[in-house]
Amino acid sequence: MDWTSDRGLALDRKQVAARMHEACDTLRRLPAGQVRGYRSAWPEMVVECLEMAGGDVIVRLAAPSPRAIDRMHEVFGWFIHLKDQRHLAVALWLTCGRSMGPSRAGGLLGIHRDTVRNRRDEALDRIVEGERRRRMAA
C-alpha cells in the first residue's frame, strides 16, 4: 500500500488507524532475537535433531520490506503527540494496531467500551492535529 503522508498531504483518522494496523503487522513480522540459553552448550547435532523432531517449532512470517519498516518507525514517532497520555496510546494501539474491538479492549483494560472508543478517537484526533501542525511548521 502506498502511503502519501510523507509528501505533505493531510492525514485523517482512517489513514492514521490503517497506518497503526500496518505498523503492528510489520512489528509482528520482524524476526525475533532468539536467546540460545541452555542449548548453547549442546552439540549442534543434538540441536538439529531436536528441531527436526518438532521441538520449538517456530512459524516464520514473511519478512517486512524496508519501506514497511520505515513506515513503522514513522508511525512510532506519532506517539510523541500522545506524550503523558498513556491511556490514549494504549487504547489506540489495542483498537487500531491490534485490531481489537472496543468491547474486547475494554475488557482487557477494565473499562467500558465507550471509554475505549472515546480514548481511541481522542488519540487519533491528537495525532492528526499534531502531524498537521508539524507539517505546517516545516
Language-model features and meaning:
Residues 23, 90-91, 116:
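Short low-polarity hydrophobic stretches
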Residues 97-115:
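Helix-turn-helix DNA-binding module
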Residues 116-134:
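DNA major-groove recognition helices of helix-turn-helix
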Residues 1-81, 101-104, 129-138:
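N-terminal interaction/assembly modules
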Residues 16, 68, 83, 110, ...:
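Short alpha-helical segments used as structural interaction elements across diverse proteins
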Residues 82-100:
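Short amphipathic alpha helix immediately N-terminal
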Residues 15, 19, 85-89, 119:
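Residue-level detector of well-ordered alpha-helical segments, enriched
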